[in-house]
Every structure is written in structure tokens, then in C-alpha cells.
Design a protein with these regions (language model features):
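Conserved RecA-like P-loop NTPase helicase motor core
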Residues: 117-188
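Well-ordered alpha-helical segments embedded in enzymatic catalytic cores
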Residues: 70-80, 103, 130-131, 148
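Generic, well-ordered alpha-helical scaffold segments in large soluble proteins
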Residues: 81, 110, 114, 176-180
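Short acidic, S/G/P-rich loop/turn micro-motifs used as interaction or catalytic elements
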Residues: 29, 33-36, 102-103, 167-169
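Conserved helicase motor "Helicase C" RecA-like lobe of SF1/SF2 P-loop NTPases
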Residues: 99-122
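Short, surface-exposed connector motifs at secondary-structure boundaries
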Residues: 86-93, 113-117, 156-160
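Interdomain helical connector at the RecA1-RecA2 junction of SF1/SF2 helicase-like NTPases
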Residues: 2-91
Length: 188
């Protein structure tokens, strides 16, 4: 049976049947964020703390801000993990999903400070599709994207993901996770 003819209603079944998807490990990083909101109120929260909906988005935006340490620390941890994976799989790649074009450039700059040269894919780049295709075929380490690598994009060598976006819809998250679950065929 061709893989395209298979349909799985549940991830557990796909894992049990084997050969289609691999398990995903989510590493939750905590951090302490402080900010002054638009009402002039001082806020100080970690990700472990429960807060109201309005502050949840504010906390996430602060965490992903280039001025703070959370984003650079997250990228550093992800880069170290990718290096470890590449000892066994030299073509393993990583994807950072960013907020917007400016954020993607900030993330790329942070990766360069770690000694990496990322491939950046932005929607206004007429070579974006070519860059994604090239990345899927080469052994570059990092792909930095804004909404360009979602449903329909197949890069089997992706092994590390950094969800550095403030888009919190379930559909977008599922599409992002979908970039990492597919098992590689022996010839990929």
C-alpha cells in the first residue's frame, strides 16, 4: 500500500503502525518575564504561572522579544541539541517559526552569533520556494521562516523546531508540528 493511501485518525495509531511518523518530544522552557503594560502596570510572571488571557499574549511577546534573554537562550539550547543529533545524522535540520519578517531577521542574527548561517524564507522573497526546496535537499542546519513552512511543505530531515511565534491557534501549531513527525525513507 502506498503511504498516500493511508489515513490515520489518531496519532497513536500512526505511531503503533510504524514507518510513517516518529514521536515528538516537546521541551518546555520556563523563564521569568517582566514588563510594563499599556495601562502602566508592572507585570512579573514565569511561564509556569497561570495568568489572564490578556497577559498571556503579553508574556509571550516579551519572551520572544529580541531584547530579552529567553529567545537567545532557547535558540542556543536548540542549537546544542541539533549539534548532538548531527553526530548521528549529519543532515538533521532545524526550523524556527517566527512572528514576522523583522523577527525572522532578529532570529537569524542570533543564530549567526552562535556561529550558524541560517536560510531565511520570507513571503515577499520571490525565491522563497526555491530556498525551501534547496534546504530540503542539502545539509544546511537552520531554516528560519514566517508562515512559509506549513501544510504541504515536506522536509523530512527536520529534527529540531523552535516555535518562536505569537500565533497560538491550534491549527497553526498542528501544521508546525507536522513538519517534524514524518519519518525519513532510507533514501532521504
Amino acid at each position: 500500500m502506498d503511504l498516500a493511501e493511508r489515513s490515520f485518525g489518531r496519532a497513536e495509531q500512526a505511531l503503533k503502525d510504524g514507518g510513517v511518523v516518529r514521536p515528538i518530544n516537546f521541551i518546555r522552557l520556563d523563564g521569568h518575564m517582566e514588563w510594563i503594560d499599556t495601562d502602566g502596570e508592572f507585570n512579573s510572571f514565569s511561564f509556569a504561572q497561570s495568568i489572564d488571557t490578556k497577559r498571556i499574549q503579553q508574556r509571550l511577546n516579551v519572551a520572544l522579544n529580541k531584547e530579552g534573554a529567553f529567545l537567545s537562550n532557547s535558540l542556543s539550547r536548540a542549537n546544542n541539541y541539533l549539534k548532538k543529533l548531527r553526530k548521528e545524522d549529519p543532515t538533521a535540520g532545524a526550523l524556527v517559526i517566527c512572528i514576522d519578517h523583522e523577527h525572522a531577521k532578529v532570529v537569524s542574527s542570533l543564530l549567526r552569533k552562535l556561529g550558524e548561517e541560517p536560510t531565511i524564507v520570507l513571503s515577499d522573497d520571490n525565491k522563497a520556494s526555491t530556498k525551501i526546496s534547496d534546504f530540503s535537499q542539502n545539509d544546511s542546519k537552520w531554516l528560519v521562516a514566517v508562515r512559509m513552512v506549513s501544510e504541504g511543505v515536506d522536509i523530512p530531515r527536520l529534527r529540531v523546531g523552535v516555535f518562536a511565534t505569537n500565533t497560538t491557534t491550534e491549527l497553526f501549531f498542528r501544521q508546525a508540528v507536522g513538519r517534524f513527525v514524518r519519518l525519513r525513507k532510507p533514501d532521504e
